[in-house]
Amino acid sequence: VTFWRGPVGGLGEVELVLPALEVVHLHDRGSRGGVMVTGENIPMSSYSGLWYGARPRLAEGRLSVAGQHAAISRRAWRASRKGRALRVWAVGREYKYRETENRRHHVLERPEAQVAMTRSSWKNPDVIFGAAHGAADSVDISLAVLFEGVYTRNLSLSGALISAPGRLLARAGD
C-alpha cells in the first residue's frame, strides 16, 4: 500500500491511499484498481478504474465524492490541454481537471475555485504539493488530491498518442 499523508491548512490531516481495495468490488480486484482520500475535516472521495501499472486509469472509471456517485467524461483527441481536460460533475458542481505545465502539474478548477497540484515525480512521487485559490473548500481539495492517485497521463497529447494503440485494441476486443 502506498499512501501520502500531510496537513492541509484549516482541514487537518489528509491521506491519499493507493491501492484502496475497499473501493473495488471483490470480483473486480483482478482488473480494477482503486484510490481513496480521507481526512479529519474532508469528505471521503474514491475512484476505481481499470488498472494501468500501479494506478487506476480513467477508462471505465467510477468516482464517488462525499458518498455520492459523480460523473466524469473527457475528449481524448482534442489538441489543447484545456480541450482534453477531464470533466467532473460532483455534489452539484462542475469541474475540469487538466494537465498544466507538464505531467507533474495538474489543476482542478470550477468557476469560483482552483486547486493546483504538483508531484515531485511523475511516476512515483515522494511528495505531492497543492495550492488552493479562490473559494476552494474541502470538496475541491479532496477531489484534487484524489486525482493525483489516478493514472492521468493521457490528459496530455503525448500521453493520448502513447495510449491510443491499447485503447483501440481494447475496443476491438469488445
Residue spans for each PLM region:
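Short, surface-exposed coil-to-beta transition loops
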Residues: 58, 82-84, 102
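Phosphate/anion-contacting hairpin/loop surfaces
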Residues: 96-98
